[in-house]
């Protein structure tokens, strides 16, 4: 008995390891893309937002300049386009049930799958939240968006200056 493991078992082990490595690679690429999209959107919203402006106001003021910047960013980075089936504003009910928040608003994109939240807490501090999604896709098998996991981040706080 020269071989402890036969050729077919060794091939099965190698294929299994290859599949696991590819899944980890796909997961890390999806997470990186969603993380970069979330941070890019957050930077744009923070640069256009001001104290007391809800998410819809930020996205529509100046002829939609913030929305145009965000859509350009997402288009350039290859973020997943989901025209007509957005998961938008999923976190809205959770945020509205938070007792430390007085006011919560949400704006969702119609072209890309992300949401922008604006919140005012009980101490009259204003901040924005961004929710993007990490996707796992199998385009060779015609399966898009097999799994999607939300990634959420808050902006820095805008304080009321009197």
Residue ranges of model-derived segments:
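Generic detector of short alpha-helix boundary/capping microenvironments
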Residues: 15, 22, 118-120
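Short, conserved structural patches
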Residues: 39, 43, 47-162
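Residue-level detector of functional hotspots within protein domains
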Residues: 10, 20, 116
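Glycine-centered recognition micro-motifs in short, flexible terminal segments and loops
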Residues: 1-17
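Aliphatic-rich helix starts adjacent to a transmembrane/signal segment
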Residues: 18-47
């Amino acid at each position: 008995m020269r071989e402890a493991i036969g050729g077919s078992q060794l091939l099965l082990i190698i294929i299994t390891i290859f599949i696991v490595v590819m899944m980890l690679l796909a997961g890390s690429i999806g997470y990186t893309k969603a993380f970069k999209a979330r941070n890019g959107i957050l930077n744009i919203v923070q640069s256009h937002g001001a104290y007391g402006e809800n998410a819809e106001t930020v996205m529509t003021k100046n002829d939609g300049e913030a929305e145009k910047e965000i859509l350009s960013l997402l288009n350039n980075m290859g973020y997943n386009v989901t025209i007509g089936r957005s998961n938008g504003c999923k976190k809205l009910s959770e945020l509205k049930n938070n007792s430390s928040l007085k006011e919560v608003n949400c704006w969702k994109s119609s072209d890309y799958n992300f949401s922008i939240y604006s919140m005012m807490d009980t101490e009259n501090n204003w901040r924005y939240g961004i929710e993007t999604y990490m996707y796992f896709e199998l385009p060779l098998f015609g399966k898009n968006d097999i799994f999607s996991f939300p990634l959420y981040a808050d902006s820095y706080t805008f304080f009321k200056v009197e």
